[in-house]
Amino acid sequence: MIKVYVIESLFDQSWYTGMALDANKRLQEHNSGKNRFTKGHRPWKIIYTEECPDWTSGRKREKYLKSAAGKKWLIKYIEQSGDTSSLPD
């Protein structure tokens, strides 16, 4: 199973969407500065994960979550879950 994940910067509240076999291990990599984009926005926390059966479906879901419609869906999902601390201002 592939995990699509969304992480939020605790520094500037920006979001990053990606996919990995192990989302927690990938989060550690983001927080250690191994990713050029996320390095300057550390530290990060996971705000959303979703399992996909394979890389192809994971990539489609990642692409959707990066779209305007996907971001709207994610904001609505977070609002409904009751954890609004991760919502953009």
Q: Whereabouts are the PLM-identified features?
A:
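Structure-specific nucleic-acid interaction/processing domains
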Residues: 1-89
